[in-house]
């Protein structure tokens, strides 16, 4: 697949007319660009989140794929740039969830033995060519999880639907500057 290139097919740019931009419901938003799964080298995608770099003001999409997480620079929305990919921590899965706290992405998946991947998003500032990234940290206290939610005020992440506590919440203190020593807190019952 093509990597590190601006992927912009003028045929994908569609205005929102009568509630649709091309084949997609649009709610008043035009479709400016589209990147195919083929470009990501993946079979499916299920979730996305965003990050705006507080230093450069650039905006990024963090896209959950069956085999990892893609990072796309959308600072020029008509010319998105696929910067790179963080491979899955274990096996493929059709479910991956991504959230952001400060300048880090927190990623869970229903893939067995995946745990929580943490990725330092400031690494995206220096990308010149497509990269395969490594996680900045991995928490392996649980294997799979369905979702992650972050309370920015308390600096806690809540992992839901994991293989721990009958799928109940796992509380994780993410206040540390370095995430290399994350530990899950036991659920209080």
Feature map (PLM): residue ranges:
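Feature marking well-ordered beta-strand scaffolds used for ligand recognition
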Residues: 1-183, 189
